[in-house]
UniProtKB/Swiss-Prot annotation:
List of residues that carry Phosphoserine: S102
The protein, known as: Phosphoglucosamine mutase
CC terms in the record's Gene Ontology section: cytosol
GO biological process: carbohydrate metabolic process; peptidoglycan biosynthetic process; UDP-N-acetylglucosamine biosynthetic process
Protein modification: Activated by phosphorylation.
Length: 450
């Protein structure tokens, strides 16, 4: 059945434009509250958000929806997505909500839902919520005496700070490291610098002055130029860039070079394999991860299991096949020993542990393999299904035939934006550029003709 609201990472869109309106947010609260209203106990939801201007509006709407369904709402305020997942379990909530559009600009917002186990909801549960959204939910409203209460929870930052600190091995401190961190003017602007400082690092922070409209604006993991400049300016040993909700991370080494999620997963996998804590004899990544990562792991007797794009697919495969390391090239890294979803800060701490134990510079620690030339370009679309056009299908088939065993081709619609993503990789950079350019031209011509 076709999804009407939920994409690869919850419901997302431009604020105050359907579906990201307060009306729909309230209805999601009623629908989710109804579905998770099981048993006779007092039900509760935890609701977090990032620092977007629209977060206050959507937070209040969701509180109204959940309380109308008879669910008590525990309001957390601005806090990272992984903290919401952790607190959903810690506070014994029936459901968790994160109001965020992750790395998107402030105009966008979104709703992510977590079950009582801290994992994102299954497709089946999301479809049940969608079905209710289309119906009259008057019958599901609580009786007057059973309306839920709303409460702002204090001390949630401290709980997450302690959780994150516990993921660094007890024999490791960060003393002697100068760390520059970019919090993307987002949800981790308070907690991330505090964790690093409490573990002993000298911390230089940027992107920690959110004003509602500057989240991810020329900062954070999708725009690391400011961090590169800061690393050079203060001569930092490492730079850490989080995104708006802090579920992804990108590293900048002491030379200013960007280290992506593929390299970070390689570092963690190799380190955990050496101390025999890696499960599944490999890691889980998506079809977008570089072929160089796959070759690196194979050379060391480890496997790379690939999934569709989206950390929920990575997590699902990890759970089914008992892996404890997974993630995406974009910097979503899931370490199931420590959490149920991507956690940029916790992933960065594992890298810092390797840096401290080896005594080597970040540029040496984090350059684990030579990436195969890879090119990713996007085509913006306004509707339709250009990938189903016969001309586009033929161009894709021709490109796959040309690459054969010397590379890979991935073409897919974005699950969060109106884009077609075209990615190719292979040992011949010129060939890759030509193939991607040709496909972009064909898709664009079909889009313009529609």
């Amino acid at each position: 059945m076709k999804r009407r609201y939920f994409g690869t990472d919850g419901i997302r869109g431009q604020s105050n434009i359907y579906p990201m309106t307060p009306d729909l947010a309230m209805r999601v609260g009623i629908a989710a509250g109804t579905i998770f209203h099981r048993g006779s106990h007092r039900h509760r939801v935890v609701i977090g958000k990032d620092t977007r201007l629209s977060g206050y509006m959507l937070e209040n709407a969701m509180v109204a929806g959940f309380t109308a369904a008879g669910v008590d709402a525990f309001v957390l305020g601005p806090i990272p997505t992984p903290a919401v997942a952790m607190l959903t379990r810690s506070l014994r909530a029936d459901i968790g909500v994160m109001i965020s559009a992750s790395h998107n600009p402030y105009e966008d917002n979104g709703i992510k839902l977590f079950g009582p186990d801290g994992y994102k909801l299954s497709d089946d549960l999301e479809m049940k919520i969608e079905d209710l959204l289309e119906k009259d939910m008057t019958a599901h409203l609580a009786k007057s005496e059973n309306i839920g209460r709303a409460k702002r929870v204090d001390g949630v930052h401290d709980r997450y700070i302690e959780h994150a600190k516990r993921t660094l091995p007890r024999d490791v401190t960060l003393q002697g490291l100068r760390i520059a961190i970019d919090c993307a003017n987002g949800a981790a602007y308070k907690v991330a610098p505090a964790v690093l400082w409490e573990l002993g690092a000298e911390v230089v922070t940027i992107g920690n002055e959110p004003n509602g409209t500057n989240i991810n604006l020329n900062c954070g993991s999708t725009s690391p130029v400011a961090l590169q400049k800061k690393v050079d300016e203060v001569r930092a040993d490492i730079g850490i860039a989080l995104d708006g909700d802090a579920d992804r991370v990108i590293i900048v080494d002491e030379t200013g070079t960007i280290i992506d999620g593929d390299q970070l997963m390689a570092v963690i996998a190799e380190s955990w394999a050496e101390n025999q804590s890696l499960r599944g004899n490999g890691i889980v990544a998506t079809v977008m991860s570089n072929l160089g990562l796959e070759r690196f792991l194979e050379d060391r007797g480890m496997a790379l299991a690939r999934t569709a794009v989206g950390d929920r697919h990575v997590v699902e495969h990890m759970r089914q096949h008992n892996f404890n390391v997974g993630g995406e090239q974009s910097g979503h890294i899931v370490l199931s020993d420590y959490g149920t979803t991507g956690d940029g800060l916790v992933a960065a701490l594992q890298i810092l542990a390797v840096v401290k134990r080896t005594g080597k510079p970040v540029s040496e620690v984090c350059r684990r393999f030579e990436p195969v030339p890879q090119l990713l370009r996007n085509v913006r679309i306004s509707g339709g299904k250009p990938l189903e056009d016969n001309q586009v299908r033929k161009a894709i088939a021709d490109a796959e035939s040309e690459l054969a065993r010397n590379g890979r081709l991935v073409i897919r619609p974005s699950g969060t934006e109106p884009l077609i993503r075209v990615m190719a990789e292979g040992d011949d950079r010129g060939q890759i550029e030509r193939i991607v350019g040709g496909l972009i031209d064909v898709i664009s011509s079909v889009r313009n003709a529609a």
